[in-house]
Amino acid sequence: MKITEAKWIEDFKEGKINGETVEVSYKTYEQAKSFYAKEGASLPDNTLMYTVYTCHTRNDHTQNLNWGLTVMEPVCVAQECNVTRGHFHEDEQCDEIYVCQKGEGLLLLMDEKGQCHAEKMREGSIHHIDGAFAHRLVNTSDSKLEVMCCWPIN
């Protein structure tokens, strides 16, 4: 029997994922300004807001899953906590799972009628996101918020 190494390794101490086919994207304040009600005059445009690690599989079968990690910095913009870009999924059948790895924050959820609610995130909490809900993360603490994510490829 052939034994191989895992394609991906999540480094829990460093808050990152290493390995094959890992895409890393960075969101700076300049790219995130539209997420906030007011601009943060004292915040440089190149301030790192969050990093996303995505583990891609090599095929596009509908049943396949993506795995990722979002690492949010403890940054405030004009007294608003750091947030990710909120979004609806194109396919409402695509649910998602979030697992809070480190830190504290909120998972904001909104239905198609604009009704909102939030779930507290803390280390070890597991959150199911219905595919029909828009969602975004909020880092409410003074340390990094690290959230593992699993969602369908489509």
Identify the meaning behind each predicted range.
Residues 1-6:
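Intrinsically disordered, low-structural-confidence terminal and linker regions
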Residues 14-120, 140-154:
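Active-site region of the double-stranded beta-helix
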Residues 106, 126-127, 131-136:
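Histidine-centered metal-chelating micro-motifs
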Residues 122-124:
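Loop/turn positions that initiate beta-strands
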